[in-house]
Amino acid sequence: MFVRHGRTAFNVEGRLQGRLDMPLDEVGRRQAFTVAQVIAAMEPDAIIASPLQRARDTAQAIGACAGLGVQLDDRLIEIDVGRWSGQRAADLRRNDPEYAAGVVSPIDYRRADGETASEVADRIVAVCQDVVAQYAGGTIILVAHGFALRTGICWLLGGDYGASRCLGGLDNCSWSIVDHLPEDVVEARGFLSPWRLMAYNCGVPVPVDVDFAKGA
């Protein structure tokens, strides 16, 4: 299961975060607290998160409800957008022709001296392959970032960056579920990929009266 981190101030302002280590804002903390209760009820076996604090803190909220520790994996970090980091997407669309080109770019387009989509997808897929090898049949929560997760999901399903643009963006603290099939089933049914998308961008409303001090 993939979970995007809770909201940050940069999400509200429409700024590209990339690898900037932005904290959750108040709404983001409420989102994390709320989704944690839902995911804990699914009885996950492990939680693995990007080390950036917006993902790490979301994962720790889930872990606190599920009674699990959080493993950190650098491969789950968000795409590196280079010099675009911290800038408003609306400003970049108006003022930076390279940004406009990058939005419709091929998979190997390097964003502002940062990363390509294929580089991001390769590391997300590698994490998923490791998870299958270590936790076969388990329910594993990967907490990370919007671009990284959407692109990684598309690669798992046999698509590419172009296909990923057919998927809507991931909301803060939404979850998506991808199931892994045994190799013999994939071969017998002629599937293109052992991965199946079971749910995408699911979420729950965030209550406005959560009292963290009382644990509710």
PLM region spans:
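Generic beta-sheet signal
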Residues: V131, G138-G146
